[in-house]
């Protein structure tokens, strides 16, 4: 295996092309190179990238959407996230990142409630009032608290509902839930 240095922009592009968790940079590059013919790569690839950049910059809504997806995928392939051993730590990290990506949509989406419980609140007392054994924890970098005494599948379901309400695509939501 050879090591090469790439600039930050290229690294983020490669990371954004990830199709499944655990896919290596070599796999991603190989797949991207196989999609293009050799003559396309030699001459026209840089020109195409520049043209796409201009088109994307005219549509700010789509650009923001792409950035949200890139941010989530970057989190999933990050060394820090991979190093987290406990599901609760991955769960809280995902929630924190979702808030950073779109705090307004996150705030609106936290209205998610269970049959008998409140999952999210802006203070610990509200969560304790909804159940004595909720074990509320603060979501770092946000004004929110979340219940944590649920099993991993319930945590995944909470993230799924949250991301769905935030407008994320189903396939990305599935990847995030599987990573928790």
Curated annotation (Swiss-Prot):
Q: Which UniProt keywords apply?
A: Cytoplasm, DNA replication inhibitor, DNA-binding
Record-level GO cellular component terms:
cytoplasm
Region Interaction with DNA: which residues? Answer: 115-119
At the top level, the lineage of the source is: Bacteria
> Does this entry carry the keyword Disulfide bond?
no
InterPro entries linked: Arc_rbn_hlx_hlx, Ribbon_hlx_hlx, SeqA, SeqA_DNA-bd_C, SeqA_DNA-bd_C_sf, SeqA_N
- Principal localization reads cytoplasm
Any one GO MF term held by the record is: DNA binding
GO biological process: any one? negative regulation of DNA-templated DNA replication initiation
Instruction: Name its cellular compartments.
Output: Cytoplasm
Which family, according to UniProt? Belongs to the SeqA family.
Q: How does it assemble?
A: Homodimer. Polymerizes to form helical filaments.
Q: Which NCBIfam families match?
A: PRK11187.1 (NF008389)
Please give the function described in this protein's UniProt entry. Answer: Negative regulator of replication initiation, which contributes to regulation of DNA replication and ensures that replication initiation occurs exactly once per chromosome per cell cycle. Binds to pairs of hemimethylated GATC sequences in the oriC region, thus preventing assembly of replication proteins and re-initiation at newly replicated origins. Repression is relieved when the region becomes fully methylated.
Protein name as it appears in the record: Negative modulator of initiation of replication
User: Could you tell me which species this protein originates from?
Assistant: Aliivibrio fischeri (strain ATCC 700601 / ES114)
Q: Which gene encodes it?
A: seqA
